[in-house]
């Protein structure tokens, strides 16, 4: 499911070419959702919290000083929720989370162009700073969100998507990663 609560809608962008080009393309399928600081975020899939950091202030504009929650799924992939607000983690390391459970509050920590959620799913991990994008775990996989329509081929940058109620899960389009 989209990483925010049903009924809410946000504009989505692909991450900047600076990010993907500077890291060998490992962030190819990362998404940025424009949203105000403090927006409740939910787990796109069930899993176990693999990493948490929420100590940096919003607006620090410093690379590798972003707050995050990372959730490892049963298939070994890791969803990353980045740029959270200070004290914005609502879960702790090792917690089991349900799909749709509130896990964090969005923010503007780290090097950003404004408040947003950076969301991606990596093949393994978690990779922690400063090794965020090291291969093989830095490689992201394409995802679709079953509670956002239309998006059979993934979300389209520049469009606003609303999280719908009902069938809510995220599926990986990569052939080696099963749907959730």
Feature-to-residue mapping (PLM):
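Short glycine/threonine/proline-enriched tight-turn/helix- or strand-capping micro-motif at secondary-structure
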Residues: 11-45, 52-61, 66-68
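Catalytic cores of extracellular degradative/oxidative enzymes
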Residues: 31-36, 101, 115, 124-128
């Amino acid at each position: 499911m989209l990483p925010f609560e049903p009924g809410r809608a946000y504009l989505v962008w692909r991450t900047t070419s600076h990010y993907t080009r500077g890291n060998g393309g490992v962030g190819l399928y990362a998404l940025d959702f424009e949203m105000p600081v403090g927006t409740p975020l939910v787990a796109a899939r069930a899993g176990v919290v693999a990493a948490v950091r929420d100590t940096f202030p919003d607006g620090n504009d410093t690379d590798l000083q972003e707050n995050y929650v990372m959730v490892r799924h049963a298939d070994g992939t890791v969803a990353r929720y980045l740029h959270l607000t200070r004290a914005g983690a609502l879960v702790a390391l090792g917690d089991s989370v349900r799909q749709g459970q509130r896990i964090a509050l969005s923010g503007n920590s780290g090097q950003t162009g404004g408040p947003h959620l950076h969301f991606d799913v990596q093949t393994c991990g978690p990779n922690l700073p400063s090794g965020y994008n090291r291969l093989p775990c830095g490689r992201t996989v394409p995802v679709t969100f079953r509670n956002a329509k239309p998006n059979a081929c993934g979300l389209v940058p520049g469009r606003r998507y609303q999280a719908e109620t009902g069938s809510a899960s995220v599926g990986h389009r990569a052939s080696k990663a099963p749907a959730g």
